[in-house]
Regions:
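Mobile active-site "lid"/loop adjacent to the S-adenosyl-L-methionine
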Residues: 3, 8-12, 17-44, 48
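Phosphate/oxyanion-binding loops and surfaces in catalytic or ligand/nucleic-acid-binding neighborhoods
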Residues: 20, 78, 106
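Conserved Class I SAM-dependent methyltransferase catalytic core
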Residues: 39-96, 101
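Residue-level detector of flexible, active-site-proximal loop/helix-junction positions
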Residues: 2, 89-92, 107
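Residues in well-ordered beta-strands of folded domains
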Residues: 11, 86, 118
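Alpha-helix initiation/capping motif
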Residues: 34-38, 92, 121
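SAM/dcSAM-binding transferase cores
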Residues: 94-140
């Protein structure tokens, strides 16, 4: 990403970045690269998203709640603003663990929604099934 300079911008960038910021890296280097932000900090994602997006482009990302809030605050410096925020709850009554965020250059108020993953152990919500059925075989 740091050395990627395409001739044109992108209308949509979708990212599932490394989550772990201040934790012990895994002994396996490949696993650490995928899970820890050491080589790709979230702030750098914003810099590159702003650079790579078209004027009406969307940057979509999933992060733990705390990191997502920090990313939103940092994104404002680069004139990227939350357009959609989905709070992902593990099950009913639990606080959200993740945020799905869509950032754009528009300064409109964000559309906020909630998504519950499981209604009970291994009993997934209809919304979650609809969202993941094309990716997870067990969701058919």
């Amino acid at each position: 990403l740091q050395a990627f300079f395409p001739a044109i911008g992108y209308d949509c960038i979708l990212c599932n970045p490394p989550f772990f910021v201040h934790s012990t890296p895994a002994p396996d280097n490949g696993r650490s690269l995928a899970r820890h932000t050491g080589t790709l900090p979230h702030t750098e994602l914003i810099v590159h998203a702003e650079r790579l997006l078209t004027p009406h482009g969307k940057f979509q990302v999933i992060l733990p709640v705390e990191e997502a809030c920090q990313l939103i605050a940092y994104a404002r410096r680069y004139h990227l603003f939350p357009r959609k925020i989905t709070r992902v709850h593990p099950n009913p009554g639990k606080a959200p663990k993740r945020l799905l965020i869509q950032l754009t250059r528009q300064t409109l108020p964000p559309v906020e929604t909630d998504l519950t993953v499981e209604l009970s152990r291994h009993h997934y919500s209809e919304e979650y099934i609809a969202l993941t059925r094309e990716f997870y075989l067990k969701m058919e």
